[in-house]
Design a protein with these regions (language model features):
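Flexible, polar/acidic helix-loop-strand segments at domain edges
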Residues: 362-489, 737, 742-762
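Acidic, glycine-rich segments characteristic of secretory precursors and extracytoplasmic regions
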Residues: 2, 8, 23-78, 101-103, ...
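Long, intrinsically disordered, low-complexity segments
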Residues: 23-24, 118-121, 193-195, 218, ...
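An aromatic- and glycine-enriched ligand-binding surface/loop that stacks and positions planar moieties
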Residues: 24-90, 199, 225-228, 233-435, ...
Length: 762
């Protein structure tokens, strides 16, 4: 029988909001409700553009979207189900939880439902495409609008392709009736379609974005370069082990030749490695790159925001809350985000090599610099200091967090993060399960051992912040922030070319591209940009170095989960055949062994704090007292009222001034000393007062035994949920996942080996 898919049956009705955003307020405010309109609107450029803007609104990745908004949910570095499947965040996601097995036939522990939530926006884009094609607009106007619309539809299909391996390809508006069927295309057909659509989009947009460019008011729209960059990402995905189980070399060669040929066109659209020739001090050029708004050359595919206040008429507020979420509580932030011990400990050392204590990517040369976990800030990659924040580090901002209800010790321009903790019960000093601690400087119970600092609008690198700082009202703190999020950065364009070059056995070119990435971060030719000397002659080592570089460069950007999936890093791919899927025969049958990567299964992630040494901890219950400052008072109170043990004369004997003299200033302007000298000074403070304490991250079982991550090989391609199967009885279930119409026995459809769409099978 012919296997077909009922697209109409699951189309959801979209609640159309009145706004969409971009870096330009004019672009934002033009996103009106153009959803329910007649075909006449397409005969006017403004009307057709309004419909296109609605497609942008429902399609662009949105850092504020969550699991309930699958059509825009693209894991932009949040502590979500994707990132919690990687080294970046603790807490088992449903994919790696050893106590949960995802399934597609019951109401609990269900597989992700990304499939069904996508079709309403695809239908919306198809309606827009048909309306523009049938309009009386000029050919140049049609090309400009259709090039964008085809890209947005392809973006939707790309997300489905990478998760499910293959999908139905619906390119016209269908009536929502059972007779409207579209077969499921196999993986090869989907790949060919995606690349063809992006080539078409790129060509349509050439006149507007290569020969010319978008105005500042249209910044955020896609370009020919955006189309090609996404195509290159898809080509790398197609060549990777997830889709390329036999390691077909022609896929790597094709990707390499195509990307190398087309990267000049991407450059012609105005894209490039931001601050490539201005690395600044201690990674400042790299950090500043994330804060550019209009005409940021790094931003190849970007989602834009504004810093509008709420309750305006009309309300065009579209804020990026990341800055608010990562800032500590004593800055009026949301208490911050916490990295795992794993991600902190694996960042490269100052010489660019992996720490010798990191037992993964062992094909890559280890550093000769000893890693000291008690002082993790010593001798690290410049990006470490811009990705994480630790006790004793300036992290300045534009604002004053002292209010009538929040009496904090610093104004923003002088802010130092002091997030060490203490306990009032000796039984908790080294108790991994206990987080009953109190933090310095009014952090009290709202404290973390280290903070994620990535993307932060640091006053040291951006004198004109992208946020409004508020001490009252609905948007307290940093909520009104317009920092953009970049789904595709130019750094990825280069690293995609590097990966393709390595796969095509052009390791010398791959290494040259790595050098450009490293130079922007602050490395120099003096030590070969921190790269091992053997990469040009060892393909496995070169590929491992590229993936390691991606992990560091793109930490907390929502890229790691997909890299781990496409390179089968959870188990090396050894479980595929057992799940009924096509076995891995390339890369020696195990990508983890090939790369020297320690399989993620069997590992766990914890966190840590820096607590005061035993002699400085309370035993009299004083720790939890109210912080002894009042509004507008930044002076230190008497010892007897200060709950911080080391700021009491009879214990630590420090004052705030003497403590602050240990703080590290990455700009090297407040503390006029080189970073290495400052870090040695801070190390002295740690040696005198602090000790690193491990605290529970991932779950323990009922017997308080630490659990480790698991992975089912069928998760590499996702199955369709029970609801999706009920709505589409002819939809073939993915191999290894329960088939509702076969009483829960496993599906047999493998996207990689399935016959082309429309093929009749018995």
């Amino acid at each position: 029988m012919k296997r077909i898919f009922n697209i109409g049956a699951i189309c959801l009705t979209m609640a159309v909001a009145a706004t969409m955003s971009s870096c330009s307020d004019e672009f934002i405010q033009d996103k009106k409700n153009y959803s329910n309109v007649s075909s006449e609107i397409y005969n006017y450029y403004s009307g057709a553009n309004g419909r296109l803007n609605e497609c942008y609104r429902i399609t662009l990745p949105n850092i504020q979207a969550g699991a309930s908004q699958m059509w825009q949910y693209n894991s932009l570095g949040m502590a979500d189900n994707h990132s919690q499947s990687t080294e970046e965040y603790r807490n088992f996601s449903t994919f790696v939880d050893p106590q949960v097995t995802l399934n597609t036939v019951t109401g609990t522990s269900g597989a992700p439902g990304y499939f069904g939530s996508s079709w309403s926006r695809i239908r919306e884009i198809n309606e827009t495409i048909e309306g523009i094609q049938g309009s009386t607009l000029s050919d140049s106007e049609k090309d400009e609008l259709l090039g964008q619309a085809f890209f947005l539809r392809t973006w939707c299909y790309y997300l489905l392709f990478r998760y499910y391996g293959s999908i139905p390809l619906v390119t016209e508006v269908q009536n929502p009736v059972p007779e409207s069927f579209t077969p499921r295309s196999n993986a090869q057909e989907c790949y060919d379609f995606l690349c063809s659509e992006l080539d078409k989009s790129a060509e349509m947009l050439k006149k507007r974005t290569v020969e010319s460019s978008w105005s500042a008011n249209d910044w955020g729209r896609v370009t020919t370069g955006t189309c090609l960059a996404l195509k290159h990402r898809i080509m790398i995905l197609w060549a990777s082990p997830l889709f390329n189980r036999d390691n077909d070399q022609s896929r790597w060669t094709n990707a390499y030749n195509t990307i190398k040929q087309e990267i000049g066109t991407i450059n012609a659209c105005g894209y490039g490695l931001a601050n490539e020739n201005a690395p600044g001090v201690n990674g400042s050029g790299w950090a500043k790159m994330f804060l550019g708004i209009v005409n940021n050359p790094e931003a190849v595919f970007v989602s834009c925001y504004n810093k509008n206040t709420p309750d305006l008429t009309p309300d065009y507020q579209r804020n990026n809350l990341w800055e608010q979420q990562i800032r500590p509580a004593n800055t009026l932030g949301n208490n911050g985000k916490t990295p795992t011990d794993m991600i902190v400990d694996l960042f490269p050392m100052k010489d660019g090599k992996r720490p010798a204590t990191y037992d993964s990517y062992t094909k890559v040369e280890a550093s000769a610099i000893a890693y000291d976990a008690e002082h993790p800030f010593m001798n690290r990659d410049p990006r470490f200091y811009r990705t994480f924040a630790f006790p004793g580090e300036y992290w300045r901002f534009n604002g004053d967090p002292n209010t009538s209800t929040s009496a904090n010790p610093y104004t923003g321009d002088k802010y130092i993060l002091w997030n060490y903790v203490w306990y009032n019960d000796p039984a908790n000093f080294d108790n991994v399960m206990s987080s009953d601690h109190f933090g310095a400087d009014n952090l009290l119970t709202s404290v973390h051992g280290m903070y994620i600092r990535k993307f932060s609008d640091d006053l040291d690198v951006n004198a004109t912040p992208n946020y409004n700082f508020n001490t009252a009202g609905k948007n307290v703190g940093f909520r009104e922030c317009m920092t953009s999020t970049m789904e595709i950065r130019y750094a990825e364009v280069l690293l995609n070319l590097a990966e393709a070059a390595c796969g095509a056995n052009q390791m010398g070119e791959a290494v040259d591209l790595l050098k450009r990435i490293r130079a922007r971060a602050g490395y120099t030719a003096d030590n070969n940009y921190g790269l091992p000397a053997n990469l040009t002659g060892d393909q496995a080592a070169c590929m491992a170095a590229i993936l390691y570089e991606r992990q560091i460069e793109f930490a907390y950007e929502g890229k790691r989960f997909e890299d781990m999936r496409r390179w089968l890093l959870f188990d090396g791919g050894v479980g595929l055949a057992g799940a009924g899927a096509k076995a891995l025969t390339g890369w020696g049958g195990n990508t983890c062994t090939y790369l020297g990567f320690k399989p993620f299964v069997g590992q766990r992630r914890d966190e840590f704090v820096f607590r005061l040494q035993n002699k400085y901890n309370y035993t009299d219950g004083q720790s939890g007292r109210t912080w002894p400052f009042t509004a507008g008072d930044n002076t230190e109170k008497k010892d007897e009222t200060n709950p911080d043990p080391i700021l009491k004369s009879n214990m630590g004997g420090l004052t705030r001034a003497t403590r602050d003299a240990y703080a590290v200033d990455l700009s090297e302007t407040i503390v006029n000393k080189p970073l290495d000298e400052q870090l040695e000074n801070l190390k002295t403070f740690y040696d005198t007062y602090l000790v690193r304490k491990k605290i529970k991250g991932d779950a323990y079982d009922s017997n308080n035994t630490p659990l480790t991550m698991s992975w089912n090989a069928r998760y590499y391609f996702w199955g369709f949920t029970q609801g999706e199967q009920i709505n589409n009885p002819n939809l073939p279930q993915v191999v290894g996942w329960e088939d509702y119409y076969k009483s829960g026995s496993n599906g047999t459809y493998d996207p990689l080996t399935a016959e082309p769409a429309g093929t009749t099978t018995e």
